């Protein structure tokens, strides 16, 4: 019996020797300390749910929350070796609900605020999308006697008539537009006292040009603009789109009138159908007006009234109008036709257009009012 007691005492001493290494030794606890600073690595890391799967966030959460917990646990294990595990577990479990309010109080990323509703624009006209959809171009050529006057100055210095120059520039316009987009279609209308549809819509420039040069001028007493629009209405059907501002149209219709008469203000009483056509966002009415404004007899300013009448037809502000003097160089007529090559849905307002690379304001104004 005496021999067994020392054995038991030795066993107890042996167990006491093992305890500091496994349970109550602070140094051993520090060795077993996890990267989060907690004493028991088997417990789930409390900061992880707060920061998600981001690895850097674990270190940030441990540096802010875990050290006070680990210091308390170490002090408890040093004073009460047997109850160290229970105290540590209690401290860690108690720290879990304590950290939840800290997680809730963390600043959240600012949520994007919903933009305030912008009131609709006060513009009176609607703009279609700026797309390069096919065009149906109706070229209306005036055949009044003013077109046959030998007044325009060609490049070589000789005098030529406006009809000859207009025929050449129309051919260049049609062929250039065809190279830009082969889906464009062209038609030809001649204007005497009445308007006559001469060539139907075609995408072949040669077909239109074959009808362009066999034309002669006539003495015209009047000009009925409404009759011209009625002829156009019989040959076209404008697209009907539900959402004008977002859905591109299958095509647009553009009328290009080359006109040279000085009969004062135009007599024009449009019907409801003509008004609807002029107000359509898919119809454009461009005008190249030839006049005698720079002749020696400058007292006659009736051409200005005619030009003002054409300007009043544009209720949308999207049409282009040019006035060219018959006493000037013929190249000005070509320049105006070149400016009309731009797609009507993609070009700017005429008052905003600039055709010069120079910064001189005077030059820009001259270029915009050719």
Curated annotation (Swiss-Prot):
Residues 1-69, 90-126 are annotated as: Disordered. GO terms for biological process: cell division; DNA repair-dependent chromatin remodeling; double-strand break repair; mitotic G2 DNA damage checkpoint signaling; positive regulation of DNA repair; response to ionizing radiation. Residues 35-45 have a biased composition (Low complexity). Its main location: cytoplasm. GO terms for cellular component: BRCA1-A complex; BRISC complex; cytoplasm; nuclear body; nucleus. It is found in: Cytoplasm; Nucleus. SUPFAM superfamilies: vWA-like. Keywords: Cell cycle, Cell division, Chromatin regulator, Cytoplasm, DNA damage, DNA repair, Mitosis, Nucleus, Ubl conjugation pathway. Component of the ARISC complex, at least composed of uimc1/rap80, abraxas1, brcc3/brcc36, babam2 and babam1/nba1. Component of the BRCA1-A complex, at least composed of bard1, uimc1/rap80, abraxas1, brcc3/brcc36, babam2 and babam1/nba1. In the BRCA1-A complex, interacts directly with abraxas1 and babam2. Component of the BRISC complex, at least composed of abraxas2, brcc3/brcc36, babam2 and babam1/nba1. Belongs to the BABAM1 family. This is BRISC and BRCA1-A complex member 1. The lineage of its organism: Eukaryota, Metazoa, Chordata, Craniata, Vertebrata.
């Amino acid at each position: 019996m005496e021999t067994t007691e020392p054995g038991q005492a030795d066993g107890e001493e042996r167990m006491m020797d093992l305890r500091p290494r496994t349970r109550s030794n602070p140094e051993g606890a520090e060795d077993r300390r996890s990267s989060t600073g907690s004493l028991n690595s088997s417990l789930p890391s409390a900061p992880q749910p707060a920061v998600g799967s981001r690895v850097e966030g674990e270190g940030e959460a441990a540096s802010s929350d875990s050290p006070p917990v680990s210091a308390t646990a170490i002090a408890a294990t040093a004073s009460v070796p047997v109850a160290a595990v229970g105290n540590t577990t209690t401290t860690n479990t108690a720290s879990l609900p304590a950290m939840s309010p800290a997680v809730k109080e963390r600043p959240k990323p600012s949520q994007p605020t919903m933009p305030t509703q912008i009131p609709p624009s006060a513009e009176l006209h609607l703009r279609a999308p700026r797309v390069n959809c096919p065009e149906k171009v109706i070229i209306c050529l005036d055949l009044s006697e003013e077109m046959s006057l030998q007044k325009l100055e060609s490049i070589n210095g000789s005098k030529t008539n406006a009809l000859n120059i207009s025929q050449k520039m129309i051919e260049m316009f049609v062929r250039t537009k065809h190279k830009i987009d082969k889906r464009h279609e062209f038609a030809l209308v001649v204007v005497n006292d009445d308007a006559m549809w001469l060539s139907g819509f075609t995408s072949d420039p040669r077909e239109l040009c074959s009808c362009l040069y066999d034309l002669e001028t006539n003495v015209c007493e009047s000009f009925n603009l409404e009759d011209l629009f009625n002829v156009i209405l019989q040959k076209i059907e404008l697209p009907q789109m539900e959402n004008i501002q977002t859905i591109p149209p299958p095509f647009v219709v553009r009328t290009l009138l080359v006109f040279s008469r000085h009969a004062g203000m135009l007599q024009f009483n449009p019907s409801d159908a003509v008004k609807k056509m002029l107000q359509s966002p898919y119809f454009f009415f461009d005008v190249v007006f030839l006049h005698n404004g720079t002749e020696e007899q400058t007292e006659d300013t009736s051409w200005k009234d005619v030009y003002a009448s054409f300007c009043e037809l544009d209720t949308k502000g999207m049409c282009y109008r040019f006035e060219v003097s018959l006493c000037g160089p013929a190249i000005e007529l070509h320049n105006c036709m070149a400016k009309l090559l731009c797609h009507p849905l993609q070009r700017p307002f005429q008052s905003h257009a600039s055709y010069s690379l120079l910064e001189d304001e005077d030059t820009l104004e001259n270029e915009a009012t050719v």
